[in-house]
């Protein structure tokens, strides 16, 4: 199942479980914990008091009561004290133990906040990496649907170095291209009606009276055929492809079982990333689905940057797209 990044109030998530990042005393809550407690009701607070305490890296579970979620999983993140006291391992344990507890209780979906990157002082970039690496590693062996929930855009941003490189690429390609395009538009408007109509080879055959049946036979290789030929050529398993593409198994099955499947552009990009395609290969696959990779679109320009630089980590790409308010690759909306 995919890792979905959403901007939402975690108390409103309709998942089987949500995660509350708490202090050691579960009867006392921080800002987010208080919001969860207020939404869940008095019985929730009573159960928290019965649980008592939670050690750093540990996870405990209560019912969700008045929340849309069936359960709340409580975990205590580490306070950052310089990075030399095992904070990274403790933070990883928070995510791992919460996921294990969710699975033990039959949860098929879970929503996480970013743990310890707020008041506990964990460096945001490092905290995001631990969260996404731990979750994506867990997803290799489970069908659980996992959400990373952030309150605002500033909570989840690309690293400063990466963002600087991407912004430069956008300035060189997307911005300049669109400025030039606006100038060309004026010229094109003056030339309407002057250009001759040019037919492709297929159009000429059809215009000459070729039967519809023969015309259809002459069509190009389909997206479906091209995709599975590429998977075979790359020597990859289907499970490896849909995991790397941040797609659910059921979504990939639809693609596999429907020869006429028409994917969204974001899905094609996700599959290109999963297959580690070059930019030319990506353009060809995109064309088979009826799209083009164009600098006229911010999404295309950002993904092109990652492909041309050989960076195929779909979570890193999605964090960047999220940072620029663009659709995510392989992401399933809640």
What is the role of each PLM region?
Residues 88-101, 116-145, 262:
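Active-site-proximal loop/helix of nucleotide/amide-processing enzymes and allied scaffolds
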Residues 1-102:
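Glycine-/small-residue-enriched capping loops at alpha/beta junctions
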Residues 259-273:
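Short, basic-rich loop-to-helix N-cap that marks the start of a DNA-contacting helix
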Residues 201-238, 315-334:
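A short, Lys/Arg-rich alpha-helix, primarily the initiator
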Residues 231, 242, 272:
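The alpha-helix within a helix-turn-helix
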Residues 284-311:
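Short, charged recognition helix plus adjacent turn
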Residues 246-263, 287-290:
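Recognition helix of helix-turn-helix/homeodomain-like DNA-binding domains
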Residues 122-209, 213, 329, 333:
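Divalent-metal-activated hydrolytic enzyme cores
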């Amino acid at each position: 199942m995919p890792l979905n990044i959403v901007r939402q109030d975690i108390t409103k998530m309709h998942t089987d479980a949500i995660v509350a990042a708490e202090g050691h005393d579960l009867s006392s809550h921080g800002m987010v914990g208080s919001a969860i407690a207020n939404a869940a009701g008095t019985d929730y607070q009573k159960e928290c008091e019965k649980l008592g305490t939670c050690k750093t890296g540990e996870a405990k579970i209560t019912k969700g009561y008045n929340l849309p979620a069936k359960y709340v999983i409580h975990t205590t993140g580490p306070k950052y004290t310089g990075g030399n006291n095992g904070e990274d391992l403790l933070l990883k344990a928070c995510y791992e133990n919460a996921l294990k507890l969710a699975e033990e209780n039959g949860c098929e979906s879970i929503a996480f906040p970013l743990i310890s990157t707020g008041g506990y002082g964990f460096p945001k970039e490092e905290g995001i990496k631990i969260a996404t690496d731990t979750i994506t590693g867990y997803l290799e062996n489970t069908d659980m649907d996992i959400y990373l929930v952030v309150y605002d855009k500033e909570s989840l941003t690309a690293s400063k170095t990466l963002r600087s490189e991407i912004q430069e690429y956008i300035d060189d390609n997307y911005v300049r291209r669109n400025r030039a395009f606006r100038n060309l538009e004026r010229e094109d408007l003056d030339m309407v009606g002057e250009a001759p109509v040019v037919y492709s080879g297929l159009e000429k055959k059809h215009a000459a009276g070729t039967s519809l049946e023969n015309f259809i036979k002459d069509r190009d290789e389909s997206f479906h055929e091209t995709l599975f030929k590429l998977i075979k050529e790359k020597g990859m398993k289907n499970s490896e492809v849909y995991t790397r593409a941040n797609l659910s198994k059921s979504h990939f099955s639809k693609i596999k079982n429907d020869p006429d499947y028409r994917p969204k552009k974001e899905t094609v990009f996700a599959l290109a990333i999963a297959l580690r395609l070059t930019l030319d290969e990506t353009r060809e696959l995109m064309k088979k689905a009826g799209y083009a990779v164009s600098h006229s679109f911010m999404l295309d320009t950002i993904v092109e940057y990652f492909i041309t630089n050989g960076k195929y980590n779909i979570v890193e790409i999605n964090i960047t797209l999220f940072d620029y308010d663009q659709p995510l690759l392989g992401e399933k909306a809640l």
